[in-house]
Regions:
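Bilobed "Venus flytrap"/periplasmic-binding protein-like clamshell domains
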Residues: 46-74, 125-191
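Soluble periplasmic/extracytoplasmic beta-strand elements of cell-envelope proteins
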Residues: 50-52, 79-81, 100-103, 118-121, ...
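Pocket-lining segment of extracytoplasmic ligand-binding domains
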Residues: 105-107, 135, 172-260
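Segments of small-molecule ligand-sensing domains
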Residues: 248-306
C-alpha cells in the first residue's frame, strides 16, 4: 500500500513538473514575442497632421485645402496653416511645427541631415516679370535704377527674384526694391508706380490670366531663359504659346519664354511611412491632370526634388 502511494506521489510530481515546463515554455515564448513586437512594430500613425501652405489666394493654400478633404476620407484631420510662403514654411518644417509643407524649388537648401524630406514636385511655377505699359525690357540688366517689386517678405518669390537679379548684377544697392502683395503690385503697375514686378505663380492662376489680359500691363519675354537653366539646375525654360490662355481673344498675343521653378511637397522625416504613401496617392489624383503647359501624368514626379 505504501509502495502504491509512493508511486502515485512520484507520478503527481512528474505531472506537475511537466505542466510547469510546458507553461514555463509558453510564458517564455509570449515574453519573447512581446519583446519582438515592441521592438519592431511601429505604433499606429497619428490621426492629426499640420501642413504649411501659403496665402489664402495662392495655389499652395488651395492645394492644401484639397489635401484636407482627401485625407478626411481616410479618417485623418489635416490642419491648414496660412503662411507668407516658402521661407516661413521651411522654418516651420525645420522647427518641427508642421508635418507637411509646400516649398518652392531653388529657394532653400535641404541638407542631408535635415529633418525635412522632399516627397515630390507637384507643378511648374513660372517666373513672370510684369512691366508697366511703355517700359520695354529685354534683359534683367536693364532694371538698374528701376522700381522693382520682388515679392513679400518670407515668400519664395522674393528669394528667387533676388537670386535671378544678383546673377545679372542687379541688387538692392543699384535698384529700388519693394515688397508688395499681389493686389498692391497690380495697382502699382497700373498706376506706373512700379517699373516691373516679379510674380511666381501657376499659369492657371486667375491673377496671372488677368495680368496677361490687361492692356495696361506687359510681360517680359525671357530671351536668355535657356542660359539661366544652365546656371541653376532647378530652373526650366518654358515657352508660353500664343493664344494658349484664350484662343478667341488670342491671349497672349505672341509666344514668349519664361523661367520656371517647381512647387515641391516636403514632409517631416519622422512622418509615419503609411501616411507618406497615402499622401503620395492623393497627390497623383490632385496633380496628375494636364494644364496649359503640362501633359497629363507629368506631375507629381521626382525630377525637381532637392
Amino acid at each position: 500500500m505504501k509502495k502504491s502511494s509512493k508511486r502515485s506521489s512520484i507520478r503527481r510530481k512528474d505531472w506537475l513538473l511537466s505542466v510547469v515546463k510546458i507553461w514555463g515554455s509558453c510564458i517564455l515564448v509570449i515574453v519573447v514575442i512581446t519583446l519582438i513586437l515592441f521592438k519592431f512594430l511601429e505604433p499606429p500613425p497619428p490621426t492629426d497632421l499640420k501642413i504649411a501652405s501659403g496665402s489664402k489666394g495662392g495655389a499652395y493654400y488651395q492645394f492644401a485645402v484639397r489635401y484636407k478633404s482627401a485625407l478626411a476620407e481616410h479618417g485623418i484631420k489635416l490642419e491648414v496653416l496660412e503662411t507668407q510662403g516658402t521661407i516661413e514654411n521651411y522654418s516651420l518644417m525645420k522647427s518641427g511645427k508642421v508635418d507637411l509643407a509646400f516649398i518652392q524649388g531653388g529657394c532653400v537648401e535641404i541638407e542631408n541631415d535635415s529633418p525635412i524630406q522632399s516627397v515630390a514636385s507637384v507643378s511648374y511655377e513660372p517666373v513672370w516679370l510684369f512691366l508697366r505699359k511703355g517700359f520695354k525690357l529685354d534683359d534683367l540688366r536693364e532694371l538698374l535704377n528701376k522700381k522693382v517689386n520682388v515679392g513679400t517678405e518670407g515668400s519664395g518669390t522674393k528669394a528667387l527674384a533676388i537670386r535671378l537679379l544678383q546673377m545679372t548684377g542687379v541688387n538692392e544697392g543699384n535698384c529700388q526694391f519693394s515688397y508688395l502683395s499681389y493686389q498692391d503690385t497690380v495697382t502699382a503697375l497700373k498706376n506706373s508706380e512700379l517699373d516691373a514686378a516679379f510674380i511666381v505663380a501657376s499659369i492657371n492662376s486667375q491673377v496671372i490670366r488677368d495680368l496677361i489680359a490687361d492692356p495696361k500691363i506687359m510681360v517680359m519675354d525671357f530671351k536668355r531663359a535657356a542660359a539661366y537653366t544652365y546656371k541653376a539646375d532647378n530652373l526650366s525654360h518654358i515657352i508660353i504659346p500664343q493664344g494658349v490662355i484664350d484662343l478667341e481673344k488670342n491671349l497672349p498675343k505672341e509666344d514668349f519664354s519664361v523661367l520656371s521653378t517647381s512647387a515641391n511637397l516636403c514632409s517631416s522625416s519622422t512622418m509615419h511611412p503609411q501616411q507618406v504613401e497615402l499622401v503620395l496617392s492623393i497627390m497623383a489624383k490632385i496633380h496628375g491632370e494636364k494644364d496649359l503647359i503640362t501633359k497629363k501624368g507629368y506631375f507629381p514626379n521626382a525630377e525637381f526634388v532637392e
